[in-house]
């Protein structure tokens, strides 16, 4: 018996959702331990036994002063670092000690964020069909996706996807993947988790590798989680916070080696080799034009903005290049100030901050009163993720 084309089309149609993917719940979490940025250079050079490097400390002080960061959360405490001097050296074998932390703490912090996202979503966790877990911190088998499934008590049949070692653009990547999963599987509810712990990158200073110091001045710990699904069931109280309209990824021209990370016996090493803010600002308009041409939008100030805050220079140069008003990056700069650069989790924190502030301010939509918005992830490659978002009325 040959199946007719019509019935096959019907099967395919029945497998797919009718509407666009929406974010149905957001949750965030950070370790309790935190550092005040103004005090961090003294602490960092003391704990790494580097106080004799006075010129380098002055450079690091300037990096921290210019970072626009007020505080950062970190799992690593002073007591722990005192017990693990190899992690405080610039290049000492320390991967085992680092792995012992991240394989436990990455899923644990992810669970905290996931519990909050599920609570806001308001549905039983048995309705979760897919899990996308992302971390740049450590690698293990079975992965953090498996550990989180166990910690949360999700169904064993949950379809899992584990993303390791992607870097700072991956907050956009997880949205792109969750969108495809939700829209191509009717009834799918995707739990997305980004969890980052800097225990894998922390190291002492080196006067021959200043680019490594940049990471020490910016990186921090945090986890964010979302529930993503299409066709929200309003009868049980499902309601989107943002809708995802399109998602794209590109590698910027002439950017090979601009940001590199390498997992070695000494942990994850981080290298900045080119003018990253310049490369991003030079190419960002092309990504915007490609994303918003179908919508007939070319006024970048008419959008709400969620950009990965790799550092203040990236935000400054993007603003100048595009002629953005200062308030466009308010939510982005707030998250950078209060949390630092949490790699893949940052843009999800900014989504959370934006919808909360929009509600507080009494504006018309979750996107600062505007209908259309853009979310950018920037990271190793240089890779850029561009997600077009639509807000919902408040």
Curated annotation (Swiss-Prot):
Annotated Gene3D superfamilies: 3.40.47.10
GO MF, one example: naringenin-chalcone synthase activity
Catalytic residues identified in the record: 168
GO annotation terms (biological process): flavonoid biosynthetic process; polyketide biosynthetic process
Keyword check for Transmembrane helix: no
Pathway terms, separated by semicolons: Secondary metabolite biosynthesis; flavonoid biosynthesis
Family: Belongs to the thiolase-like superfamily. Chalcone/stilbene synthases family.
Function: The primary product of this enzyme is 4,2',4',6'-tetrahydroxychalcone (also termed naringenin-chalcone or chalcone) which can under specific conditions spontaneously isomerize into naringenin.
Annotated protein name in UniProt: Chalcone synthase
Organism for this UniProt entry: Matthiola incana
The organism's taxonomic lineage, starting at the top: Eukaryota, Viridiplantae, Streptophyta, Embryophyta, Tracheophyta
């Amino acid at each position: 018996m040959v199946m007719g084309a019509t019935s096959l089309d019907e099967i395919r149609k029945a497998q797919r959702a009718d509407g666009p993917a929406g974010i149905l719940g957001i949750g965030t979490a950070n370790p309790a331990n935190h550092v005040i940025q103004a005090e961090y250079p003294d602490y960092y050079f003391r704990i790494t036994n580097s106080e004799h490097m006075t010129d380098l400390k002055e450079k690091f002080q300037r990096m921290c002063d210019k970072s626009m960061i007020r505080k950062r959360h970190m799992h690593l405490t002073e007591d722990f670092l005192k017990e693990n001097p190899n992690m405080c050296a610039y290049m000492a074998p320390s991967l085992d000690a680092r792995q012992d932390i991240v394989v436990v703490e990455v899923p644990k912090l992810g669970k905290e964020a996931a519990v909050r996202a599920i609570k806001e979503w308001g549905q039983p966790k048995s309705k979760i069909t897919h899990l996308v877990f992302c971390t740049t911190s450590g690698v293990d088998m079975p992965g953090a996706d498996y550990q989180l499934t166990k910690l949360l008590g999700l169904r064993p049949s949950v379809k899992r996807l584990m993303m390791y070692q992607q870097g700072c653009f991956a907050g956009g990547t997880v949205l792109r993947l969750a969108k495809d999963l939700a829209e191509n599987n009717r009834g799918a509810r995707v739990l997305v988790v980004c969890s980052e712990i800097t225990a894998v990158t922390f190291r002492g200073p080196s006067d021959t590798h200043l680019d490594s110091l940049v990471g020490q001045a910016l990186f921090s710990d945090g986890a964010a989680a979302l529930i993503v699904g299409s066709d929200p069931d309003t009868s049980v109280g499902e309601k989107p916070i943002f809708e995802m309209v399109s998602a794209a990824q590109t590698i910027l021209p002439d950017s090979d080696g601009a940001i590199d990370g390498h997992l070695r016996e000494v942990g994850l090493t981080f290298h900045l080799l080119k003018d990253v803010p310049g490369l991003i600002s030079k190419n960002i308009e092309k990504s915007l034009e490609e994303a918003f041409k179908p919508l007939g939008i070319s006024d970048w100030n008419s959008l709400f903005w969620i950009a990965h805050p790799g550092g203040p220079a990236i935000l400054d140069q993007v603003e100048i290049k595009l002629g953005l008003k200062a308030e466009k990056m308010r939510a982005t700069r707030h998250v950078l100030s209060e949390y630092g650069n949490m790699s893949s989790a940052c843009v999800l924190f900014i989504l959370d901050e934006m919808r909360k502030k929009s509600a507080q301010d009494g504006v018309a939509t979750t996107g600062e009163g505007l209908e259309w918005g853009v979310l950018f992830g920037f990271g190793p490659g240089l890779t850029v993720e561009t997600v077009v978002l639509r807000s919902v009325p408040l």
